Amino acid sequence: MPLDRVKWRPPKQNGAVDRRVVVNPAQARELLTAVSYVGRSRGPRLRAMFACMYFAGLRPAEAAGLRRHDCELPATGWGLITLKKTRPQTNKRYTDSGETFDDRGLKHRDDDLVRPVPVPPELVAILREHLDAFGTAKDGRLFVTNGGRSFSGSAYAQVWKQARALALTPDQVESPLAARPYDLRHAAVSLWLNAGVHAPEAAERAGHGVDVMLRVYAKCIDGQRDVANQRIEDALA
C-alpha cells in the first residue's frame, strides 16, 4: 500500500504524571521561599498563590480566582477553602465579560457546585500573612498586581522560572523537577496518596474522579505493593 494512503494514528496519551516533576516537601518550601525574592512585589504577591497549589492542590486558575470570603483562616489549626469559581486566562474575544480573564465554574463540575478543600495550618499562616501584607482587590480576590489586576499566566510562569534558578541546583533546573507551577498540584496529590489518604477523599480535595486520579498519579505512588502485601498478610493471620 502506498505510504500516502496509510492512516497513522498517534498513540493515546493516558495523562499520567511523570514522577520526576514531583518535589518533596523540603524542595517545595525552598521554592516558595525563593518566589518571595523574585522582583520587588511580584514574587512576594505570588508566593501564597503558589503555596495554595502545593498545600491545597489547587489548579492555577482556581488559585487565581480565590476570594477572601472563600477562605476560613483560623488563628490556629486547619482552615478551609471553598472553591466556587476559577479565573482562567483566555482570548478576550471569547469571554463573557470581554476581559482577558473571566470567571468560570469549577472544572468537571456544574456551575452551582462548590468544592471544599481543608488546608493545613502552614498554608493558613501563609494566607493570613499575605492578607496582612497586601489585602485584596475590590472584588475580594487575593492574588492581584499592585494595580489590582490579575496576573497573566506568562507573569507567574516567569516568576516561577526565576524561583527555580534560585532554589534548585543547576542539574535540577535542567530537569523536569517542578518545571511548571502546575507541578506543585501534582506534588500535593502525590503526597496525599503516599501519606495514605483514602483515594475518594484525595479525589474530592483535588476535584478529580477517583478513577482518573489513580490513573494520572499511578507512577507517583511509592511502595503500594509492599503495603498491600502486608495488609493481605495481616488479614490472613
Predicted regions and their residues:
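Short, basic (Lys/Arg/His-rich) helix/loop patches that form interaction surfaces
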Residues: 33-46, 56, 117, 125, ...
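Residue-level detector of conserved, well-ordered beta-strand and adjacent loop positions
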Residues: 17, 24, 32, 84, ...
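Intrinsically disordered, low-complexity basic tails/linkers immediately adjacent to helix-turn-helix/homeobox/MYB/SANT
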Residues: 232-237
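Basic, Lys/Arg- and aromatic-enriched nucleic-acid-binding interface segment
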Residues: 1-66, 76-78, 102, 110-114, ...
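Short linear motifs centered on Gly/Pro in flexible linkers and helix caps
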Residues: 14, 108, 179, 222-225
